[in-house]
Amino acid sequence: KVLEDQYKSMKAWVDYMTKNSKNDLWNTGFHFGDWLFYRPFDDNDGRSAVTDKYLIAQSFWAYSTQLLINAANVLGKGNDVSEYSSLLKRIKDAYLKEYVTPNGRLISGTQTAYVLALNFDMLPESLRPSIAQRLVDNIKDYGTQLTTGFLGTPYLCHVLTRFGYDDIAYKLLLRDKYPSWLYPVKMGATT
């Protein structure tokens, strides 16, 4: 019942993003980006933790479209499944052309960019292991700490464990030095 009630608004949201995209890229208008990411330094070597806001928008457009496809499947809306599956392919193809270099690197080499690309399956399966390794390398380069903000953080440990990096996920989870999830607890925070 809830899915039936919300289906129209889900479809309207995906249609809004589609209408406001250009050449299958949602890179127009205002986008927040990854809010409250940790920025320890920016040494001008491409290690800044700032993730391209349009890469983020494209990733979440794909995710929203996938959720709509899932809902359409459950509700037996075969025409919508077909239509939005075609759209999803175009969204991911445009992502590859715009945000992935010919040698398989993301143009935005941040933890959030890697996490979203992997969590939302934005990349061909052949590229995923190397991108997962780049994520781990980035985490280690920052002293085994996260630099993700609100948009990358919820998926970080899931992506690490999905690609076999349980040890890194546990190190991040159990870290109690700033920045970390346990630092506020160690400092006596109660919320």
Model-derived regions: residue spans:
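Active-site core of glycosidic bond-cleaving carbohydrate-active enzymes
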Residues: 1-191
